Structure formats: C-alpha cells, structure tokens
Amino acid sequence: MQFLYRSLLLALAVVSLTSCGTYTELIGTWTKPEYMNKGYKKVLVFAVGTKSLVNQSVAERAVAIRIAKTGTVAVPASDVFPLATYDANKDGKIDDPTIADKLAAKLKVDGYEAVLIFGVKDIKEQQRYVPGTVTYQPTSYYNGWSNYWATTYQTVETPGYYTTDVEAYVEANMFDVQTSDLVWSAQTEILNPGSLSDAADSFAGTIVPSIINNGLVSTK
C-alpha cells in the first residue's frame, strides 16, 4: 500500500496540470444492521499505507474535521500514534509485532468507541483524446453576393489534445473498538485529484455523509 501512495503522489503531479476539479464517487457501502444508529461519540481516524507523516496527517484531518462538525470527537491517528511509534525507519513494516494489541488496548483506555481506517487500494491512469472544436461565426457583410459569400462564415478552431485521467480507489472501514466488529465499509473512486489536499477534502465530503446517514456518529 505504501507503493500505491507513492504512485498517487506521482499521479497528482501529472494530473494537476490538466485537472478540472477533484470528484469522488461512492461506489458502494455496507453497514452492519445491528450497529445502525449506534451514535459513536469518539472516533479515531486512521489513514494507512503512507510513509509520510505529513501525508497521513492531511488525509486524517480532512475526515476528522468533517466528522467533528456533527459533535462527535474525531481524532487523527497521527496525533495519537505517530508513525515513528510503529515504523521508525519507514520501511513499510511494523517494528513491534505486538503493537496492534497495544494500540487496541490504548483505544479502550482512552475512551474511543470506533476507529475509521482508510487507504488507497488501486490507482489507474488513462489517457484520452479530447477532440478539437470549430465554431462558425456569422458576419454582417451584405455588400453584394461576392463579399457575402467570401465572408459569410469566419471560423474559430480549437485543436484537440491528449489528457490523462487519474482514478484512485480508496477503501474505508469502521470498526467497533469494544467488539472489533466491522460496522461500516465503503469503496470510493477519486477522479483527477488535483492535490493531496483536494483529494482528502473530496474523499471526506463523500464518505462522512454516508457515516452520518447510517447513524454511526452522534449529532448535535
């Protein structure tokens, strides 16, 4: 997954030159029936698969801010579990094999009720051709048929060009801290992310309403 995040950053550099705006589509969601309207009051937001604390923080904060607007306490994992605590050399491998159990225990002690984990699952780049256009502009010359014929239409031509579309597939899962049950899951497609910040904001604006609509966070 670390490779996917590096690929996404490279793709962002390409698409930012031609992007018309970031768009996130919610491909599918699932909610465990018995957890609907659970109304979690404290949630940890965890972005996985990135070696950069900055990138992790940007993604987590975008989602946490959206959730916090409902009245739920939403905390970025990078504030609680810095990358250095489990992958000090940033090699994509967990240093302490018991860290998962330690994190789970700490979440319970600190009063977290749910943890939302998300990460990039796949990235695709597609090149497409945008056809040129020809616009005809009528003129107002009526000085005889020849002049009219010669200048009846002026044309404005825009040449065609190639552009690259970037599609990033991001999966999000919410777990109950006490039972470890998967309570909600979503698959999304982010189209042409102009920047990491744009992608994070677009992603957050798409998944958080689904979480709210299923009653998984408390509301004011």
Give each language-model segment a name.
Residues 21-41, 50, 129, 146-220:
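C-terminal/domain-edge helix-coil "capping" segments
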Residues 16-19:
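C-terminal motif of bacterial Sec signal peptides marking the signal peptidase cleavage site
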Residues 95-174:
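Surface-exposed short loop/turn segments
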